[in-house]
Protein backbone atom coordinates (compact mmCIF):
# COMPACT_ATOMS: atom_id res chain seq x y z
CA UNK A 1 0.00 0.00 0.00
CA UNK A 2 1.11 3.55 -0.66
CA UNK A 3 2.44 5.67 2.19
CA UNK A 4 -0.67 7.87 2.19
CA UNK A 5 -2.73 4.84 3.26
CA UNK A 6 -0.58 3.96 6.30
CA UNK A 7 -0.74 4.95 9.93
CA UNK A 8 2.74 4.84 11.44
CA UNK A 9 2.98 7.53 14.11
CA UNK A 10 2.35 6.64 17.73
CA UNK A 11 0.37 9.87 18.21
CA UNK A 12 -2.06 8.78 15.47
CA UNK A 13 -2.47 5.34 17.07
CA UNK A 14 -3.13 6.90 20.49
CA UNK A 15 -5.69 9.36 19.04
CA UNK A 16 -7.60 6.53 17.36
CA UNK A 17 -7.51 4.36 20.49
CA UNK A 18 -8.90 7.22 22.60
CA UNK A 19 -11.40 8.88 20.24
CA UNK A 20 -12.37 6.02 17.96
CA UNK A 21 -14.73 3.16 18.63
CA UNK A 22 -13.88 -0.52 18.60
CA UNK A 23 -15.48 -3.67 17.24
CA UNK A 24 -14.11 -7.15 17.80
CA UNK A 25 -14.50 -10.81 17.04
CA UNK A 26 -12.37 -13.71 18.25
CA UNK A 27 -9.55 -13.04 15.77
CA UNK A 28 -9.40 -9.25 15.34
CA UNK A 29 -10.11 -5.95 17.07
CA UNK A 30 -10.84 -3.01 14.77
CA UNK A 31 -10.67 0.61 15.93
CA UNK A 32 -12.16 3.23 13.60
CA UNK A 33 -12.09 7.00 13.79
CA UNK A 34 -13.31 9.62 11.33
CA UNK A 35 -10.65 11.78 9.71
CA UNK A 36 -11.91 14.83 7.86
CA UNK A 37 -8.42 15.88 6.71
CA UNK A 38 -8.11 13.15 4.07
CA UNK A 39 -10.39 11.69 1.42
CA UNK A 40 -9.31 8.04 1.77
CA UNK A 41 -8.83 5.51 4.53
CA UNK A 42 -5.60 4.98 6.45
CA UNK A 43 -4.63 1.63 7.94
CA UNK A 44 -2.57 0.70 10.97
CA UNK A 45 -1.83 -2.94 11.77
CA UNK A 46 -0.73 -4.28 15.14
CA UNK A 47 0.40 -7.88 15.59
CA UNK A 48 1.87 -8.70 18.99
CA UNK A 49 5.07 -10.68 19.44
CA UNK A 50 2.99 -13.07 21.54
CA UNK A 51 1.41 -14.40 18.33
CA UNK A 52 4.61 -16.00 17.08
CA UNK A 53 7.86 -15.41 15.28
CA UNK A 54 8.45 -12.66 12.70
CA UNK A 55 7.56 -14.92 9.77
CA UNK A 56 4.11 -15.68 11.20
CA UNK A 57 3.45 -12.07 12.23
CA UNK A 58 4.38 -10.81 8.76
CA UNK A 59 2.14 -13.45 7.15
CA UNK A 60 -0.82 -12.15 9.16
CA UNK A 61 0.02 -8.53 8.28
CA UNK A 62 0.30 -9.37 4.57
CA UNK A 63 -3.10 -11.09 4.63
CA UNK A 64 -4.68 -8.06 6.34
CA UNK A 65 -3.09 -5.64 3.86
CA UNK A 66 -4.21 -7.77 0.91
CA UNK A 67 -7.79 -7.71 2.16
CA UNK A 68 -7.72 -3.91 2.27
CA UNK A 69 -6.19 -3.73 -1.23
CA UNK A 70 -9.02 -5.86 -2.62
CA UNK A 71 -11.70 -3.64 -1.04
CA UNK A 72 -9.83 -0.34 -1.43
CA UNK A 73 -12.55 1.35 -3.48
CA UNK A 74 -15.34 0.28 -1.08
CA UNK A 75 -13.84 1.56 2.18
CA UNK A 76 -14.92 4.86 3.73
CA UNK A 77 -12.45 7.65 4.50
CA UNK A 78 -11.59 6.67 8.07
CA UNK A 79 -8.55 5.87 10.14
CA UNK A 80 -8.59 2.13 10.85
CA UNK A 81 -6.43 0.08 13.20
CA UNK A 82 -6.55 -3.71 13.03
CA UNK A 83 -5.18 -5.68 15.98
CA UNK A 84 -4.67 -9.41 15.51
CA UNK A 85 -5.57 -11.71 18.40
CA UNK A 86 -4.18 -15.13 19.31
CA UNK A 87 -6.60 -17.28 17.22
CA UNK A 88 -5.47 -15.49 14.03
CA UNK A 89 -2.14 -17.31 14.08
CA UNK A 90 -3.73 -20.66 13.23
CA UNK A 91 -5.83 -19.35 10.32
CA UNK A 92 -5.26 -19.58 6.59
CA UNK A 93 -5.22 -16.45 4.44
CA UNK A 94 -8.77 -17.12 3.26
CA UNK A 95 -10.02 -17.55 6.83
CA UNK A 96 -8.27 -14.31 7.83
CA UNK A 97 -9.96 -12.55 4.92
CA UNK A 98 -13.43 -13.83 5.86
CA UNK A 99 -13.02 -13.02 9.55
CA UNK A 100 -11.68 -9.54 8.81
CA UNK A 101 -14.51 -8.79 6.37
CA UNK A 102 -16.99 -9.87 9.05
CA UNK A 103 -15.59 -7.51 11.69
CA UNK A 104 -15.23 -4.64 9.17
CA UNK A 105 -18.90 -4.99 8.20
CA UNK A 106 -19.87 -4.72 11.87
CA UNK A 107 -17.63 -1.63 12.17
CA UNK A 108 -19.46 -0.09 9.17
CA UNK A 109 -16.26 0.60 7.26
CA UNK A 110 -17.63 -0.29 3.82
CA UNK A 111 -19.55 2.30 1.79
CA UNK A 112 -21.72 -0.36 0.13
CA UNK A 113 -22.72 -3.98 0.60
CA UNK A 114 -19.90 -6.50 0.17
CA UNK A 115 -20.73 -10.13 -0.59
UniProtKB/Swiss-Prot annotation:
Catalytic activity: Endonucleolytic cleavage of RNA, removing 5'-extranucleotides from tRNA precursor
Recorded superkingdom: Bacteria
Annotated EC: 3.1.26.5
Top-rank EC class of the record's enzyme: hydrolase
GO molecular function, one term: 3'-tRNA processing endoribonuclease activity
Segment forming the signal sequence: none
Coiled-coil portions: none
One Gene Ontology biological process: tRNA 5'-leader removal
InterPro entries documented for this protein: Ribosomal_Su5_D2-typ_SF, Ribsml_uS5_D2-typ_fold_subgr, RNase_P, RNase_P_CS
Key words, A-Z: Endonuclease, Hydrolase, Nuclease, RNA-binding, tRNA processing
GO cellular component assignments: ribonuclease P complex
Job of this protein: RNaseP catalyzes the removal of the 5'-leader sequence from pre-tRNA to produce the mature 5'-terminus. It can also cleave other RNA substrates such as 4.5S RNA. The protein component plays an auxiliary but essential role in vivo by binding to the 5'-leader sequence and broadening the substrate specificity of the ribozyme.
Family: Belongs to the RnpA family.
Subunit note: Consists of a catalytic RNA component (M1 or rnpB) and a protein subunit.
Protein name listed in UniProt: Ribonuclease P protein component
Gene this protein is translated from: rnpA
